[in-house]
């Protein structure tokens, strides 16, 4: 929806969000802003902070088999990224889960529609054990296959981080949200919607699964109200509306780039997220 970004290497970002210059391993890398490191930091701290709860699902108990624990990404990208303002190469978000050793996920499900990214993911995860499942194709069309890979009785988390607003449909979120234990971390592209509000109507409706937003969003300044509508939509699946958290991620000018929305059906999960949100990636006091 928005104009392609330019990075320090010159040239616009590719339509799939990748940098024009490959990584040092010769494979594609996603081109991201420096604020991506903030998102990764929150996710990394969350994965670490939930290891005690997750470990209970990784071992048999009371004669019952282990429930398991899955990490899911609907828009996994190529597995590595480059900060467009500095050229720094960083691991993609899938590797936050892959490399976590405290209470390792029993299943890692990565969905990606771009063929070049799928090929890069396959190569970058080739030496790993059999935990990783890569689903090639549009996550909206392959969601049943994705859900089939997730432990039904496990403690699971899904990162929903689309490149822009267009690729995601609420029906896809609904399939994940209907699972008994599924924490959601959703990238909500607030600034992108503000910049393109006049032509983003169809995208917003598909993302939120409702037309109600048209009654409350009349100008770009109203876009933040969309977050509340998404919260109310998730409430239908057991995520208490007042407990669905939204964390604004800002750029260097202090403008909000996007909201990182966290939803859980578990009281402990909210407590953990609130603790994490109190401190930013730079060690500053956060919102709570």
Residue spans for each PLM region:
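Class I SAM-dependent methyltransferase Rossmann-like catalytic core
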Residues: 2-66, 86
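SAM cofactor-binding core of SAM-dependent methyltransferases
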Residues: 41-145
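Short, conserved loop/helix-junction motifs that constitute active-site signature segments
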Residues: 100-103, 176-180
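Short amphipathic alpha-helix with an adjacent loop that forms part of the alpha/beta core around
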Residues: 142-151, 174
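A short, conserved alpha-helix within the catalytic core of class I
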Residues: 165-176
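Conserved beta-strand signature within the Rossmann-like core of class I S-adenosyl-L-methionine
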Residues: 180-195
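A conserved mid-domain beta-alpha-beta active-site/ligand-binding segment of alpha/beta enzyme cores
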Residues: 195-252
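Flexible, glycine-/basic-rich loop-and-beta segments that form/coincide
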Residues: 267-288
């Amino acid at each position: 929806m928005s104009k392609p970004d330019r990075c320090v290497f010159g040239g616009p970002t590719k339509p799939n969000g990748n940098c024009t210059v490959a990584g040092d391993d010769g494979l594609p890398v996603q081109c991201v802003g420096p604020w991506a490191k903030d998102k990764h930091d929150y996710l990394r701290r969350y994965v670490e902070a939930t290891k005690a709860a997750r470990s209970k699902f990784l071992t048999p108990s009371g004669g019952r088999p282990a429930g398991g624990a899955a990490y899911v990404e609907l828009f996994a990208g190529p597995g590595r990224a480059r900060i467009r303002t500095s050229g720094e190469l960083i691991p993609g978000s899938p590797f936050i889960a892959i490399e976590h050793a405290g209470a390792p996920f029993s299943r890692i499900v990565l969905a990606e529609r771009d063929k070049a990214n799928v090929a890069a993911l396959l190569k970058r995860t080739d030496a790993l054990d059999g935990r990783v499942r890569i689903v090639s194709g549009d996550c909206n069309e392959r969601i049943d296959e994705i859900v089939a890979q997730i432990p039904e009785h496990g403690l699971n988390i899904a990162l929903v981080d689309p490149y822009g607003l267009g690729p995601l449909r609420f029906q896809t979120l609904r399939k994940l949200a209907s699972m008994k234990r599924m924490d959601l971390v959703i990238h909500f592209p607030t600034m992108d919607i503000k910049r393109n509000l006049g032509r983003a109507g169809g995208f917003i409706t598909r993302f939120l699964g409702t037309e109600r937003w048209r009654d409350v969003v009349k100008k770009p300044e109203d876009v933040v109200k969309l977050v509340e509508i998404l919260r109310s939509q998730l409430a239908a699946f057991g995520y208490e509306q007042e407990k669905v958290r939204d964390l604004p991620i800002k750029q260097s000018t202090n403008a909000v780039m996007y909201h990182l929305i966290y939803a859980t059906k578990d009281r402990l999960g909210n407590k953990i997220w609130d603790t994490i949100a109190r401190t930013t990636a730079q060690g500053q006091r956060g919102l709570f």
